[in-house]
Amino acid sequence: MASNHPAFSFHQKQVLRQELTQIQSSLNSGGGGGGGGGGGGKSAPGPSGALPTCSACHKMAPRTETPVSSISNSLENALHTSAHSTEESLPKRPLGKHGKVSVEKIDLKGLSHTKNDRSVECSFEVLWSDSSITSVTKSSSEVTEFISKLSQLCPEENLDKLIPCLAGPDSFYVERNHVDLEAGLRFLASAPSHTLKHDHVRKFFSSSSPSQQLQSPSPGNPSLPKVGAVMGVSGRPVCGVAGIPSSQSSAQHHLQHSASTSASLPHCSHTGGTGSALAYRTQVDNSPTILMPSSLQTPQPQEQNGILDWLRKLRLHKYYPVFKQLTMEKFLSLTEEDLNKFESLTMGAKKKLKTQLELEKEKSERRCLNSSAPSLVTSSGVARVTPTSHVGPVQPGRSSSHASELRVEVEPPAHQLPREGSSSEYSSSSSSPMGVQVREESSDSAEESDRRVDIHVEGTEKEKPVMLLAHFPSSSARPTAQVLPVQNETGSSPAAHHPLPPQLMPAASHLAPVRMLNSVHKSDRGGADVKLLSSSVHSLLSLEERNKGPGPRSGTKVDKSFGGAVLDPLPSAAPHPPGQGLSGLVENNAVSPTVSFGPRAKVVHAATLDRVLKTAQQPALTVESSSATTGTPSTVLHVARPPIKLLLASSVPADAAIAGQTSCPNNGQISVPPAIMNPRTALYTANTKVAFSAVSSVPVGPLQGSFCANSNTASPSSHPSTSFASMASLPSCPAPSSSPALSSVPESSFYSGGAGSSSPGNIPASSQSHHHHHHHQQPPAPPQPAPPPPGCIVCTSCGCSGSCGSNGLTVSYANYFQHPFSGPSVLTFPFLPFSPMCGNGYVSTQQYGGGSAFPVVHTPYNGSVTPDPVLGGQSTFAVPPMQNFMAGTAGVYQAQGLVGSTNGSSHKKSGNLSCYNCGATGHRAQDCKQPSMDFNRQGTFRLKYAPPAESLDSTD
């Protein structure tokens, strides 16, 4: 019967069949050897040896426990659940001796299907009025007759109405019979005491037909071992065949046996009918029965819901009871053969299930392949990068002073899915934040898909693949490019930067996000673990992993993407010159990003990121800038000696304490060039949880440098590429101006309409040679101070370096993005002329005070007006209140026509003020008496747009 029980999987049924057959045969053959030998060789006799038996007594002999080794274990494994059998400690009443007692309670303990699956056997545990307990097994037909008779004897119970179908069990489907039978059984379990005391009930449960007697089949088998009485959680026997536990047994003396001990229980059996509740029944068909205890531990509810949902999708949820006992894993691994075992399934259902399960298996296989092989990413072009200057395995060289040049061949995918985050999306009007909202909404699914692509590659000594993975997420995942060095250089060797051959450029110009992975291979000096970081940076790259080995090694990861803001790294610990930091400028334009290295901040083309500055002073260096598809321009920078963890990530809530503690002792400064922030995403998205918390703990001097860029220029050669930041150093910094320098060469073609189509032809060779400098500096030598370039003068009108006569402002980012924004702060009204969404695509520079937690941006106009907190103060907009961020004469967020004067104290006259809450003019939203609107409802924005003041330029 167990072989047909729907509660068991195919494998469980097979194991059960084998085990039970062995037990049955061993019981029949080796019965005379006492309790310990009852297992027939499978269980060794315990310390007590053969247990005493007394064939004449009707009471149980005192318990002497003998551990049974393998029978119970195998059965327990077959059932995949542990349970606790407590019933053996209860007084067992010999069958047939119930003349003076009545039934107190009936518990249903299990249903067993016979081979034809038509009849069901029910096992009951009966508590008698003298506190004895017996176990009775009856067939469903007997139970049906009993309940129908009981309904005649006790007409007031309305049993016939309760179970109208029990009279003709064969005229209904098995499922229907089970339902009806269960209704009757439930009634028996909850029957009132006067019904249970009825003579008919007493006779029914005190008599037993020979095939269902619970006594031992022959007097020559006096002691029957209890198999599988394992103490567990549920208080139920797992594998006692007719094992019926009792809930009243907690007071009994047998509860002290340990969780994994199996007890072999001697039973005094008598031919007259004394028997143990745990004795195996002799089946007419000789197939052993297993009774499922009612509290058999079922799989987790969520797994159950998973199966149910899965079946619902196929419109097969009515068959859910068939698979109820399976886990999701087992359910999905069912084969056609297994499905054929379920006789209650129709042919159509089996066929449908078979097809869907095969599809599911293919999907999971594909997923496994994806997670094990980094090159198998759905809809991705794969590029193989071969190191050209190495013949053997690529290993970190001890004394080699050259960097191997990498050749990249990109095989673009057959079809590129239209994806958000492509350059065409960013070339739209910079004043439309609608795209930001869409990107933000899809970023959750993006993180899901990214997590799937999170691949951990362990570099081994034998392998030397260098892979470039062009990742094209269809759901606006934050695609990234990661470059890891193929070689380590010791501190004495100068670092050379070789550009990638231009084959990469055609790919890069329209492949947009690229994921590059150059696996670093371990050598005896220790290598680096290569991680293909999922760009949902929720899995922190732990630098301890990268620094387990003894020798200096360098793993540099550049996670490049669109909308990447740039951070200068912290240099290594104080004994070393702090100027050895890498300043990586990962630009938004895929055509020509630039990277600057070293204290002198030489500009290097982004194609050379395969060779980054690696010195002994910087054992691990990682730059990662995740894509703006989540709405945040960001750069993640790890620079640390082995004990240090530093992570600055836009999509990760960074640990401020860790970052703060590690940044200050390292004498490092972090500067962020404002011109590279994506203006549409810097302020308004929920994912702008830019956790630059380390920056807030590092004193940063004014950022000097010149930015000049026009939004219609696509060629990087037209921009000054040598503007760097000369940072004021910390007091403990040995060489002030040698702190990490920043290359600020924004490629504004990222924002131009032609950014998506800007071709590598725009990068002249002269521009490339102009970008690349080889920097040779011996570590012992004191760092040479970089000459401070002209101040960071940015024209607030056109973005030029100040030649048009407008005033500019120097910038100091002291507390840059200290706290993440709260809530989904997407502004969905593109008709407001908010300057950070305009202004040639650049967020103008600004000075941030010590307490400012958010960046505020200057208006593109130089009018003497002050910020009206258009975005602040109301809970309707989850944007930080901008009034708190005034620092000196720094302009705060200024919107045209809605602002006052720069001293930050007075507002414009109220005639031009407009309340975005009620739509009226003359007061601000902070003073509005109307209840604030629900920002999530579409179409409720009631703004009466006030025309811009005459003093401002009317072209914007």
UniProtKB/Swiss-Prot annotation:
This is Zinc finger CCHC domain-containing protein 14. Residues 25-50, 78-99, 206-229, 243-276, 361-464, 485-505, 543-583, 750-786 are annotated as: Disordered. Residues 438-464 have a biased composition (Basic and acidic residues). Residues 369-389 have a biased composition (Polar residues). InterPro entries: PX_dom_sf (IPR036871), SAM/pointed_sf (IPR013761), ZCCH14_SAM (IPR037632), ZCCHC14 (IPR042344), Znf_CCHC (IPR001878), Znf_CCHC_sf (IPR036875). Residues 206-225, 246-265, 423-432, 750-768 have a biased composition (Low complexity). One of its GO terms (molecular function) is phosphatidylinositol binding. CDD domains: SAM_ZCCH14. Keywords: Metal-binding, Zinc, Zinc-finger. Pfam families: zf-CCHC (PF00098). Residues 29-43 have a biased composition (Gly residues). A zinc finger (CCHC-type) spans 913-930. The gene is Zcchc14. PANTHER family: ZINC FINGER CCHC DOMAIN CONTAINING PROTEIN, ZINC FINGER CCHC DOMAIN-CONTAINING PROTEIN 14.
